[in-house]
Amino acid sequence: MTRDKRILFIGGSPCSGKSTVAERISKEYGACYFKVDDFLDEFTKIAAGKGKPICKQVVKMTSDEIWMRDPNLQCDEEILIYEEISDLVFEKLEQTDSDFIVTEGAAYTPDIMRNYSYQEYISIVPSAEFQVSHYKKREWVPYILEGCADKQKAFDNWMERDILFAQRIKAKCDEYSIPCIVNDGTRSIDELYKTVKEMFILE
């Protein structure tokens, strides 16, 4: 990838405040905001078409087949999906017509980022309590679970998957000495934003 672009990477786990922080950086500093989640379905289908095994499997699954499985298996699968689409994510970043980009997504796992050797990378993960309480407020949650026979069990499995994912990301960040913020809701969004700006040395 072209290295004359400045790219601020915010990885971590869902429902941690990543997108809110990225949006504020974009507005305050004029950075182009690249949200990986906007391309997840597209990239998963492309990877499936290229024969990537996990993506190929997932695109054919029903809601029950996705959400009613062991959360540990779901977490393993999520990490593998991000690995299978990583080339597509970075290709899209390369095509983005801006020399200053802020990008966020759970797809930026510590292992993937080590492969690409980018320095300006942090992660934000939520505490389990913060994650679940905020997911319950999301308007699109029922849409994701549409088609599940037992929506409560599916939601519980989803939450457990993301709790496990956050734990794995935090452990990898600690192992690799990558800055990682745990958002437990005790700090305001302004305080979280200030911390991230300091990590990226944004004045």
Residue ranges and their predicted role:
Residues M1-K5:
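Phosphate-binding P-loop
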Residues I10:
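Hydrophobic anchor at the beta1->P-loop junction of P-loop NTPases
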Residues C15-S16:
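ATP-binding Walker
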Residues S19:
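Walker A/P-loop
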Residues A31-A47:
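Short beta-strand-centered segment that lines the nucleotide-binding/catalytic pocket of NTP-utilizing
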Residues E42-F100:
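ATP-dependent small-molecule kinase phosphotransfer cores
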Residues E120-F165:
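A glycine- and Lys/Arg-enriched "phosphate-lid" helix/loop adjacent to the NTP-binding pocket
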Residues L164-E203:
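NTP-dependent small-molecule kinase module
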